[in-house]
Amino acid sequence: VLVLGDSLSAAYGIRLEQGWVALLQDRLESKGYGHRVVNASSSGETTGGALARLPRALERHRPAVVVIELGGNDGLRGLPIADVRANFESLIRLSRDSGANVLLIGMRIPPNYGATYTKAFHELFGELAAKHRLPLVPFFLDGIALDDSLMLEDGLHPNAAAQPKLLEMAWPKLEPLLKR
């Protein structure tokens, strides 16, 4: 299972072993899955940066599943939606062409760039999931982002207490892909 993500998957601000990706490895082992988790996440990562790194990661790890948890940094920087969409399309195509199943994890952004951009960004994940028939976690921080007890002081990143909740957001969509 290759997790291609940003700071939310790279355990930003907490110990790596507290992050949801490390908890995913524990869950797989406890449930008897033979899958190994490779965390190819990087704080500050964009879809473009991940796209540059993906071919080598696919070749090196040959994943059965690729989890794409990206887009937040693209949105926070106001990158053109068409470019972000094209990057996601390429990430999905490369992953699928390698033989992997894909899970798309959606993100939302604050309305810094206006309602039109914010709406287009939010809708992008559902559109990609529908077009490519992908399982989708619509908003990874649902029930977390607005709860101060689950966020670091920066208000952007989930804390250690939030990590089991992030795993529970992803698990129902991820587990069926492990059985294919």
Range-by-range predicted roles:
Residues V1-S43, R53-R62:
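Serine-esterase "nucleophile elbow" of acetyl-processing enzymes
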